[in-house]
Amino acid sequence: MYRPSCLSYVLLVANMWSFAVCANAFIYGSYDPSHNIPIVALMTLCATGLWLSTSVVSFGIRYVRVRVSPEKTQNRTIYVSSGLPHFDPVYGVVKKCEPMGGGPAIELQVNPSWIHLLPTSPAINKVEVGQESAILGSTYSVVETGGEPKSLVAVKSGDSTLGFGARVYHEGMDVLMVPHHVWYNDKPHTALAKNGRSVDTEDWEVEAACADPRIDFVLVKVPTAVWAKLAVRSTKVLAPVHGTAVQTFGGQDSKQLFSGLGKAKALDNAWEFTHTAPTAKGWSGTPLYTRDGIVGMHTGYVDIGTSNRAINMHFIMSCLVSKMETLPPELGYREISLEDVGLRSFEFLEVEIENRGKVKLGKREFAWVPKGKAWADMLDDDDLPLPPKMVNGNLVWADAQESFDGALPLNLLAGGRTQCLAAQIELGDYKFSCGPTHETGGMPFRNCGSSTCKFREVSRKPVADAVTAATKVFPELSELGWPERGSGAEIGSLLLQAGKFVPTKAPSNLEQAYNNLLSRYPRSKPLACFRQGTWSFDAIFEQVVSKATSAEINQKASPGVPLSRLATTNKDLMAQHMQFVAACVTGRVPLLASFEDIHALSPTEMVEMGLCDPVRLFVKQEPHPSRKLKEGRYRLISSVSIVDQLVERMLFGAQNELEIAEWQSIPSKPGMGLSVIHQADAIFRDLRVKHTVCPAAEADISGFDWSVQDWELWADVEMRIVLGSFPPMMARAARNRFSCFMNSVLQLSNGQLLQQELPGIMKSGSYCTSSTNSRIRCLMAELIGSPWCIAMGDDSVEGFVEGAREKYAGLGHLCKDYKPCATTPTGQLYAVEFCSHVIKRNKAFLTSWPKTLYRFLSTPRETLEDLERELASSPMWHKIQSYVRSIPSPDKTARDKSICNGYPLDQEAISTSYSEYSSKSASAEATREAACCAGAQAYPSWGIHGPYCSGDHGEA
C-alpha cells in the first residue's frame, strides 16, 4: 500500500502553484518577458514531469526484474490405516496400510516404544518432527483458494514449507513478520509463496530480530515490488485479549491450506500467551488472526494435545522494536529503570533484540540494559521539550539550568506562585467568597465561590428499547436505570453521601497496627531527581515529561479543572500544551516541598497559592439500582486535575508500580486481574492457606470513600514515606500533597465551588485511590484484630473477628454486612466473593452480570465477543448468549461469519462455556454425514475430522 511522504505533498503544492502561474501567464495572456516567475514555474512543471517519468520507468524496471515462477510443491505418498493393529509373532505389532491413490497395501511395523500411544493419548497429537501440536477435540477446516487472509504468506525452502508469516504494518512501513527459527532455519529460505505463486527471497534487510526461543521473531523489510507480485496486503497487529477467538492457517503449500480455531489465554508475562487453535507440521509462525487483525504469532506447543504457545507481537513491536517515545495504553505495559528491576521479587528474562539492544523482561514490565538500546543514540538531547526560564519576570522557553533546595523554588511571584502556576489559576478565573455551609450531619461543605471552567450539563440517558425488550427474559434489568446528570444531581448526591461521614479519633493501637502492616509491603526508591539535597529544574522537568507521555495517562479523560478550558481530553492537552503542563507540575512539586505550615491554610487558600486545583465532581454514567435512583444517591467521581495527578505520579509512582508488580505477595491487590483464570486461582490458593490460620470472612463497607478518616490518610502517607525512602524535601512534599488531598475544594459542572470544612474523604479520581484504599482497608482489619487481610480498594477478604461490625463502626466505617465465607463440609474454603466476583477453585465469574448486560444492550459499539470476555464464566452466560444471538442486530451477534475470512464459523471448534447450573454445555449444530473432510485425508493418522466428516478415515 502506497503512503505519500511529506516530499510528495510539498511537490503537489509546488506544482499546483506552478500550474496556476503558467495558466495565468500563457493561457490568459498576462505573460511579461521581464518576469522570471512564469519561467521558473514552467521549469518546475517540466522537472516534476521528468522526475515522475523516471520514477515510473525505474519502478517498471524493478517490477520486470522480479521473477515469478510456479511454486515448488512436494509430492507425497500417503498411506491410510485400513485396519486395527495386530500382533505378528515375528515382527511384533503391525498395521495394514493402503496408499490413498490406490495400489498394493503394505504392513507397517509399530515401534515397541510407541505401542502405548495407540489409544487416544495426548502424545499422539504431537507432530512427528517439530514444535507443532494438534489439540484434543479440535478440528481442521479446508480453506477455499483465495479465502485465506490477504496478509498470509508461506516461507519456502525448495519444495518444503518452513512455516508461515504475514505482512504487517509497523510505523510507516510494511514488514514480514516471521519466527526467527523459520527465517534462520537449517534449511535456507528460498522463496515466499502465495496462492501457488512464489518469488525468490534475497538478502533483505532485517528491521529487528531475536534469536531467543522465548521471543522468537524477525521483522524483514521486503521490497514493495515483491508484495505487489504476490498480491499480499498488510494488516495491523493488535493486543491479544484473554478469551478472544483466534484462527490459525497452514498446510504443505500455499494453495492447499487448512485452518484451526481456538481461544487465546493470557499469561502473567506480557510477551507470551497460549492458545487452543490446532497446528500441524510446517505451521510454524502462523499468525493468530481475529476479526480485526493479528494478535500474535504461533511458535510451538506448551502441552501436547492441550495448548500451543504464541508470542505477543503487539508487545514486541510497540515496546521492544518501536522507536516511538510513548507506549501504547491498551494493556499497561510499563518501562522501568534497570535499578527498579532489582526491587522486584520475580525473575526477569534478559534477551537481545537485533538493532535495538539488550532488554530485561518481567511480567508486564521491561527495562533496557545501559548501552543496549542502540536506536536511542539516534535521538538528540534537544528532542526533549526544553524547560522554561524566568528572564526579567517573563517565562522564556530556552535552555535553563536552575536548581532549588529547601527554599522557595525558582523565581516565585507574590503569593508563592510560579509564573506557570499563576497562569493556570487565571484559567480557572476563580471567584472565591464565603457562602453558607451545608450541614449534612457528617462532612460539612461550604459554598466558597465559582469558576468559569464549566462543563456541559446534559439530561438523563433514556432507557434503550433493547433493554426494555430484554426485561421480559431478564427481570433483573428492570431494577436498573441511568442516573440523573448535571449540577443538581451532583450537589444532591454529594450532601447525601457526605452525611455518612462520622469523624473519629485515631485509635490507641494505631502505631502497633501501622508497624505490623508496614512490614508486609516491599520497599522502593524515589526518583533520581528527588534524591539530591538540591533539586534540578531540568531533571524534574524531564521526568515530568516522561510521566505525562506514558501509557498510564488516560488519553480520553478530561484534564479536570482548570485545564479543561484548554482542551477537552488529556490527549489534546498534551499534544497542544505539553510544555505548559510540565512546567506547572515542575513548579508545584517544589512548591509543596517548601511549605512547613500548610495546615494553617484553608482549602481555598491552597488553591489560591497554587498548591493544588479544585476537584471536579460528576455523576458516573453506569446503571444504578432503582432504590438508589429513588433516593438520589448516585455514584460520584472526584476528578483530580491532570497536574495534581502528575504530582502524585512523581511522588508515589515508584511505590505504586512496585506494589502492582508484587501483588501476589502483599496484602494490597491493585495489580490483579480476575478475568484471567490463573490469577483468580492464585488468589483462591492463597486464601485457602490463610483460611487454615483463621476462617475467611467477607465485609461490605457502605460508602467507603465517604467515610475515610484523616488519620487513616496520614497513616498511609507516612507508610509511603518509609517504604519509598523519601528524603526530607520529598517527604514534606508528600505530606503536603496529602494535606491538599484531604482538604479539597470541589467543583460542580456549573462551576459552583464547595469547600470541605473537615479533613478526610477519599477522592475517587486520584492516582493513589486504589493503592491508598487497599492499604487503609488492610489497616482497618489490623486495627480490629484480624490476623490477615487482602484488599482491592474497599473490597476485602479477611480473617474472621467477632463483633467486627461494631469495631468498624468505632473507626468511622459502616459495615452493612459481615459474614463467613462459604466452606465445604470438611471446613475447607469453598468460595469467596471479592471485587464483584465469586472465586472458587479454577473458576471465577462476575456477579454483577445485570449491570454488564444492561450496559451492553445500551451501547451499539459493543459486540458479543466483548460481552463474552466479561461473562463467559458466569452461570447466566448460556441464557444471555442465546438471547443476544436472537436479537436482529448483526453488529451485536456476529455469528454468521468467520472471524476473518467470511466462511461459516465452525460451531464445534469453540464450544460454549460450561455452566455449573446445567447438566451439559449447549449443544453445537448437528453434523451432517458426508464424505470424509480434506483435513482427515491430509492427516489420516491423527484421528482428526472436520465438523461434517463421516469418520471413515483416520481410525487407529
Swiss-Prot record:
It catalyses: RNA(n) + a ribonucleoside 5'-triphosphate = RNA(n+1) + diphosphate. Residues 694-808 form the RdRp catalytic domain. GO terms for molecular function: nucleotide binding; RNA binding; RNA-directed RNA polymerase activity; serine-type endopeptidase activity. The chain crosses the membrane at residues 7-27, 37-57, 77-94. One of its GO terms (biological process) is viral translational frameshifting. Its EC number is 3.4.21.-, 2.7.7.48. The record marks E132, S133, E325, T326, E402, S403 as: Cleavage. It comes from Southern cowpea mosaic virus. This is Replicase polyprotein P2AB. Gene3D superfamilies: Trypsin-like serine proteases (2.40.10.10). Keywords: Covalent protein-RNA linkage, Host membrane, Hydrolase, Membrane, Nucleotide-binding, Nucleotidyltransferase, Protease, RNA-directed RNA polymerase, Serine protease, Transferase, Transmembrane, Transmembrane helix, Viral RNA replication. Residues 135-330 form the Peptidase S39 domain. CDD domains: ps-ssRNAv_Solemoviridae_RdRp (cd23180). The polyprotein is proteolytically cleaved into several chains by the viral protease. PROSITE patterns: PEPTIDASE_S39, RDRP_SSRNA_POS. The active site is at H181, D216, S284. It comes from the Viruses. GO terms for cellular component: host cell membrane; membrane. InterPro entries: DNA/RNA_pol_sf, Peptidase_S1_PA, Peptidase_S1_PA_chymotrypsin, Peptidase_S39B_luteovirus, RNA-dir_pol_luteovirus, RNA-dir_pol_PSvirus.
